[in-house]
């Protein structure tokens, strides 16, 4: 994604914040799996949305109207030894020249620099409760400058929920965001097709799941969440992720899988017969679900309430289950009692 996209987002946010304010947002950190092995790093979504910076141990600071630059990025310094072991770091120079920061400082110096940036502002925009350790540090910085307020130092008087503004912004997608969402969806569609093509009785759920691993990695995408590949009764477990059982002839296979491209995810769930042929009962239920899907999609349009697609699907499913005698009663009453 182009730097202009991130700059536009930051500018829009700072306009909403107003004067004499400061926004402070921490990146995600690496999480240890065992001994010297970390889990794959996944950047904080809000941090990525505003910066595009995909390293751990970083802090974004926005100060509307700051003379020396409104966007400050604290990040790790270049370190040849650490980079030999763990990969390249941007460092302060690249943070400015490549990633678009106006100013960049070493993350290890944040305790010395950030209190001075807080001074003179009325409000601090932050997301409290996400990273407790960072919350404590931020409160410590505020308390530090409060102790010096008697000497005329102006101290911020309130914390404001940054996510209140930010998540409203994220609801509205730009053309570039839509492009990435469509790309993630297209990759996921191909993965589902691969799974359907190789599926047969006698294989194991994990063999089907491997098709998603292959297709995603071939297009530089990651899993958006653990894939659910459940044959037979396993498909009734809402968050089944064991994916270890054999696939049996005559049963259905449910797959709920999605990939992520540059932070934008796809999410597709499909159910189909393991042997390629629906039984009469399977076909009847499948047709109801398909009709519910189509009814929901028709309700996805500007002006409708966000719950309209759900309500349309519920009505079709309830009516269909009554017709199959799997539910008894009046459709409207059953929906009301849901």
Task: Set out the residue ranges of the language-model regions.
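Active-site neighborhoods and metal-handling regions in enzymes and metal-associated proteins
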Residues: 1-338
């Amino acid at each position: 994604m182009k730097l202009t996209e991130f700059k536009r987002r930051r500018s829009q946010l700072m306009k909403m914040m107003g004067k004499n304010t400061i926004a402070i947002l921490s990146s995600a950190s690496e999480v240890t799996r065992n001994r010297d092995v970390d889990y794959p790093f996944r950047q904080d979504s809000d941090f990525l949305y505003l910066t595009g910076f995909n390293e751990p141990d970083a802090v974004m600071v926005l100060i509307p109207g700051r003379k020396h630059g409104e966007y400050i990025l604290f990040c790790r310094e270049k370190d040849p030894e650490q980079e030999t072991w763990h990969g390249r770091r941007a460092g302060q120079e690249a943070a400015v020249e490549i990633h678009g920061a106006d100013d960049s400082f070493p993350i290890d110096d944040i305790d010395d620099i950030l209190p001075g940036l807080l001074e003179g502002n009325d409000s601090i925009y932050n997301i409290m409760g996400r990273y407790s350790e960072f919350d404590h540090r931020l409160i410590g910085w505020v308390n530090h400058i409060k102790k010096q307020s008697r000497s005329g130092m102006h101290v911020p008087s309130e914390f404001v929920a940054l996510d209140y503004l930010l998540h409203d912004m994220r609801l509205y997608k730009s053309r570039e965001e839509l492009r990435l969402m469509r790309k993630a969806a297209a990759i996921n569609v191909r993965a589902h097709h691969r799974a359907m093509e190789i599926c047969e009785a006698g294989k194991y759920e994990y063999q089907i799941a491997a098709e998603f691993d292959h297709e995603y990695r071939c297009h530089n995408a990651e899993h958006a969440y653990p894939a659910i590949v459940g044959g037979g009764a396993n498909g009734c477990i809402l968050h089944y992720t064991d994916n270890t059982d054999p696939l049996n002839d005559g049963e259905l296979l449910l797959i709920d899988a999605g990939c992520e491209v540059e932070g934008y995810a796809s999410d597709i769930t499909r159910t189909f017969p393991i042997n390629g042929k629906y039984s009469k009962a399977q076909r009847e239920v499948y047709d109801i679900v398909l009709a519910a899907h189509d009814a929901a999609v028709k309700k996805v349009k500007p002006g409708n309430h966000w719950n309209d697609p759900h309500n349309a699907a519920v009505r079709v499913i309830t009516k269909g289950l009554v017709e199959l005698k799997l539910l008894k009663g009046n459709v409207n009453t059953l929906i009301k009692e849901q």
